[in-house]
Amino acid sequence: MSMFCYQCQEAAGGRGCTVKGVCGKTEDIAKTQDLIIYVVKGIAIYSSQAREMGLNTSEADKFIVESLFSTITNANFDAKALNSRVQKGLKIRQSLKDDIIKAGGSYNSKENKSWTSKFLSVLGIKNDKDEKEIHDAAIWAANNPEDFKKKAETVGVLATENEDIRSLRELLTYGLKGMAAYLEHANNLGYAEDSIHAFMEKALVATLDDTLSADELTALVLECGKYGVDVMALLDKANTSTYGNPEITKVNIGVRNNPGILISGHDLKDMEELLKQTEGTGVDVYTHSEMLPANYYPAFKKYKHFVGNYGNAWWKQNEEFEAFNGPILMTTNCIVTPKASYKDRMYTTGVTGFEGVKHINPSKDGKKDFSEIIEHAKRCASPKEIEKGEIIGGFAHNQVLALAPQVVDAVKTGAIKRFFVMAGCDGRMKSRNYYTDFAKALPKDTVILTAGCAKYKYNKLDLGDINGIPRVLDAGQCNDSYSLAVIALKLKEVFELEDINELPISYNIAWYEQKAVIVLLALLHLGVKNIHLGPTLPAFLSPNVAKILVENFGIGTISSVDEDIKMFMN
């Protein structure tokens, strides 16, 4: 069976990639990622049991989160690293099984599929005798890449034959991938929440359960949105407690004459470590793409060698990384297949990887040594200037709520007629120019609320302000969509409305990968309706599942700029 992947917006033909991913991943990489997800589901069977028995599941929790994150679009293209992850997962699964048995669980090795223990709860995966039946994901084992390849042929997306069940399982899985990304960043800063891990396990096991109906899976998808809100709140707490609340900031987009390091991705812990280790070395630090919001945090402003932001959204990195001249550190997705001209200047860390690119691992104490990349930078020319000037951001919930009287007054007087939430992702497709044109064409009495790399379609336009309030309010990274929800809920309270949908807020969201999926599910959980997704609806939504979202939540897509503005403003 050839590869099949349809988890991102750029799925070939709007259906799925079957030869090579538009993202650049090969058939082998795609299938290995499928196998990682399968192994993770097997681990979840055991870890959910171990958790209920009060056993330590921290190693499994960490592995599940990292593994889900490693399979997100544009995160890891390193076959060796991914195969190692499969091997590690099988060891963790075996360790969990051993712990359960030691704690009183009895495993019938002769039958090889029956659990019998008063300590173990029923998974919901049963046989005709109403006994526990352990899924193949919990018992399959192998120890070499060739056997991995054979197994991977059988466990991909299309292994679920029913189109609607498949759609719901994948929607849930992609929501979990987005959740894992946010949880990883929170965990890196020392923040965790056991209930989120428990839900992830429960949901992963549910995707193996053939007894669950479409209605039951739909309920789980919506529950995923609840935990999406929780994980974004946790990450917001982690970021703001550690680095302070983002504040209105003018960010330099030009360059200086010193050698520099460009840091891309989302991990603020990596940002902190890099700034500390480069201080006093003569090497400057620039953010790229989704790392731009690091400029808004007070804790990072003390570093005089932190210059500003270089470049635009992730998909332009080929030309921008080439022009930067210095080394690039990818802390998370999005990686585009690197050009030979800069591949030797590229470094990955965390769950990211690309074959032939140097990877920086943490030491036993969790610290990362960036000395190699710093010394590399010293040997490089300073960045080539590709633009100059400033952009403004830092409008997360704390900052906007500080401006609440001004904002509320502007709404009451009619100076602001409507807010447009245009959070989400940017991407390669030319149809995404719609969002630039949309921003330009919006009436002058409207304000854009944004988060994520979607901002690059309009954050350098001169759209002016309304009574001193910029018409583009950038809250930060994609996870800072949480801030936009907090702002909306506060406005609902201020205006004494019963329903969040009564606010003068429209949602025109550009999506690309799985973090956008968890943001969408979180908004649905909060009761937001009539969200428009573009430039296309997800390929993983079957007609029937899409119909559920349309009928129950008013989900729509985009048409033309003029038609959409007319529709939103009425």
UniProtKB/Swiss-Prot annotation:
Q: Matching Gene3D superfamilies, A to Z?
A: 1.20.1270.20, 3.40.50.2030
CDD domains recorded for this chain? Answer: HCP
Gene of origin? hcp
Name the lineage.
Answer: Bacteria, Bacillati, Bacillota, Clostridia, Eubacteriales
Q: Which residues carry this modification: Cysteine persulfide?
A: C425
Q: Which cofactor does it need?
A: [4Fe-4S] cluster; hybrid [4Fe-2O-2S] cluster
Where is the major localization of this protein? cytoplasm
Protein name, UniProt field: Hydroxylamine reductase
Could you say which enzyme class this protein belongs to? oxidoreductase
PANTHER family for the chain: HYDROXYLAMINE REDUCTASE (PTHR30109:SF0)
Q: Which family does it belong to?
A: Belongs to the HCP family.
Q: What keywords sit in the KW lines?
A: 4Fe-4S, Cytoplasm, Iron, Iron-sulfur, Metal-binding, Oxidoreductase
